[in-house]
From Swiss-Prot:
Family membership noted in the UniProt record: Belongs to the FBXO45/Fsn family.
GO cellular component: cell projection; extracellular region; glutamatergic synapse; nucleus; postsynaptic cytosol; postsynaptic density; postsynaptic membrane; presynapse
Record localization: Secreted; Postsynaptic cell membrane; Presynaptic cell membrane; Nucleus
Main localization (coarse): secreted
Entry keyword set: Cell membrane, Cell projection, Developmental protein, Membrane, Neurogenesis, Nucleus, Postsynaptic cell membrane, Secreted, Synapse, Ubl conjugation pathway
Keyword Cytoplasm: no
PANTHER family hit by this protein: F-BOX_SPRY DOMAIN-CONTAINING PROTEIN 1, SPRY DOMAIN CONTAINING SOCS BOX PROTEIN
Gene3D superfamilies hit by this protein: 2.60.120.920
Name of protein: F-box/SPRY domain-containing protein 1
Gene Ontology molecular functions: ubiquitin-like ligase-substrate adaptor activity
Protein's GO biological process: anterior commissure morphogenesis; cerebral cortex radially oriented cell migration; cerebral cortex tangential migration; corticospinal tract morphogenesis; DNA damage response; innervation; neuron migration; proteasome-mediated ubiquitin-dependent protein catabolic process
Organism: Rattus norvegicus
Amino acid sequence: LASRALVCKHWYRCLHGDENSEVWRSLCARSLEEAMRTDILCNLPSYKAKVRAFQHAFSTNDCSRNVYIKKNGFTLHRNPIAQSTDGARTKIGFSEGRHAWEVWWEGPLGTVAVIGIATKRAPMQCQGYVALLGSDDQSWGWNLVDNNLLHNGEVNGSFPQCNNAPKYQIGERIRVILDMEDKTLAFERGYEFLGVAFRGLPKACLYPAVSAVYGNTEVTLVYLGKPLDG
């Protein structure tokens, strides 16, 4: 499609003009049939945005052997494997620009449930029940169970920085905001900005990622595009 758009004005208008054109509708019908029957993509305003989200979804080739990506293309299912922590990265990482995505658990959290970012070098599986995301210098994570921020195997304080921060509720969508210009990672809950969690991120390609420990739990990640200011 991209190559056609370069040589044909009609295709260019279809791809870069109307984001709900028949081209994008057709791609959604063909690639996202399962997801379109649910509310997974309800916060995406156009068919083009839905297709883009699928391009940025979890990678079936870059996750622990103990998880699989469901037919909807956006949800990770962790198999009930004892003494293992399992993660997944998305298909596409970011080295520039500003990006936002939503993550939510659709099952129990267990003792550790971490959302954040990772380089391509960060491991996506380890023994035991640990905070895999944030366990080394290649990943940064927020543990939704105890509200700790994790990087390089250390706790970098609690988050959000307020008294009696509410615990995560299953099904609650958390918005993650990665700013590769300012080198920061921030979070929102229910459109409430919770603050910047990490600063001084490296000039590297960083991927949205999660890690989970509870058997048969499921995690969904949906890429939203450029975050809205304000």
